[in-house]
């Protein structure tokens, strides 16, 4: 993993490339009518967490209000500020996370167990959106492999499938097809079992020392730092181990633009924009824009490249 330095972290820029797909589906009038909100204030009413601090404590992080105020979470609207606005009353307790499928030991975690079942630790990761913007985030959580080891995958298990909560009464984007970007909910993502078992793959329940804010995927989300952000599914209620590969949400919506693997790759462009460089979200104002080269696997090439040995990454994007 390439060591992060202060220059890896972010000046601010508003970048709405994903809105192009909204236009492609005839939803531009609705999307552009949505309000833009200022960056969220740092939250003081979220649960403080007990966790092992990262040894990378000298790193300068993306400001908390940018991480909590600049989000893609289409269940709460397609505008970057919509999730912070529309999710502010989202109820995450009680919560159930069901783990099942091709496992010997299916089980369920309640809200409190999300924070206590496994020891929590801080992981400072790069975060790269497919829209070509980036952050550095101090996630708090536990390795997904710990949860999978408890479930004991069977020999048939090849994929790990994740489902976001389906609750149209709380999630306006699920209730209104246009407000939610034309997605067929619930949101579904998946990893190969090898990807899911990798030590970098995190189940996050917090950031900046506190429980996740609703707009960041409370109470529990996936974080896969070498993949584009849409793979890091939010507000998960079900994890199913499967013998067959599912069709994931963005792959189903636009398969020519969003592949199953979604590995960060500067040599494989999105059909409508380059992935060779990225804009960073950080402490500066709108005029302090910084662009930096995109790193293969988002800087985690040494750790994860072996997972894709022999795989054509241009075809399997």
UniProtKB/Swiss-Prot annotation:
Its main location: periplasm. It is found in: Periplasm. Mo-molybdopterin binds at residues 71, 74-75, 129, 164, 216, 221, 232-234. Its EC number is 1.8.5.-. Binds 1 Mo-molybdopterin (Mo-MPT) cofactor per subunit. One of its GO terms (cellular component) is periplasmic space. One of its GO terms (biological process) is protein repair. Pfam families: Oxidored_molyb. Predicted to be exported by the Tat system. The position of the signal peptide cleavage has not been experimentally proven. Residues 1-40 form the signal peptide. Part of the MsrPQ system that repairs oxidized periplasmic proteins containing methionine sulfoxide residues (Met-O), using respiratory chain electrons. Thus protects these proteins from oxidative-stress damage caused by reactive species of oxygen and chlorine generated by the host defense mechanisms. MsrPQ is essential for the maintenance of envelope integrity under bleach stress, rescuing a wide series of structurally unrelated periplasmic proteins from methionine oxidation. Belongs to the MsrP family. NCBIfam families: PRK05363.1. This is Protein-methionine-sulfoxide reductase catalytic subunit MsrP. The gene is msrP.
């Amino acid at each position: 993993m390439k060591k992060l330095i202060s220059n890896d972290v972010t000046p601010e820029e508003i970048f709405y490339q994903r809105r192009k797909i909204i236009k492609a589906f005839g939803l531009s009038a609705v999307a552009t009518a949505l309000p833009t909100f200022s960056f969220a204030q740092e939250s003081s009413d979220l649960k403080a967490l007990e966790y092992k601090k990262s040894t990378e404590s000298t790193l300068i992080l993306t400001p908390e209000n940018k991480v909590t105020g600049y989000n893609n979470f289409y269940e709460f609207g397609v505008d970057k500020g919509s999730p912070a606005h529309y999710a502010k009353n989202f109820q995450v307790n009680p919560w159930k996370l069901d783990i099942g499928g091709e496992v010997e030991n299916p089980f369920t975690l309640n809200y409190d167990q999300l924070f206590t079942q496994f020891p929590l630790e801080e992981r400072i990761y790069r975060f790269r959106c497919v829209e070509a913007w980036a952050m550095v985030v101090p996630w708090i959580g536990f390795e997904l492999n710990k949860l999978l080891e408890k479930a004991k995958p069977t020999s048939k298990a090849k994929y790990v499938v994740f489902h976001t909560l389906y609750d149209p009464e709380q999630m306006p984007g699920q209730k209104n097809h246009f407000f939610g970007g034309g997605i067929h909910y619930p949101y579904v993502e998946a990893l190969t079992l090898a990807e899911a078992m990798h030590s970098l793959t995190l189940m996050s329940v917090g950031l900046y020392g506190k429980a996740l804010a609703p707009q960041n995927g409370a109470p529990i989300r996936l974080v896969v730092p070498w993949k584009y952000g849409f793979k890091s599914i939010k507000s998960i209620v079900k994890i199913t181990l499967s013998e067959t590969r599912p069709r994931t949400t963005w792959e189903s919506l636009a398969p020519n633009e969003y592949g199953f693997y979604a590995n960060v790759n500067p040599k494989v462009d999105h059909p409508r924009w380059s992935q060779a460089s990225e804009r960073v979200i950080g402490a500066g104002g709108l005029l302090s824009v910084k662009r930096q080269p995109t790193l293969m696997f988002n800087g985690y090439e040494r750790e994860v490249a072996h997972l894709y040995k022999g795989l054509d990454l241009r075809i399997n994007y």
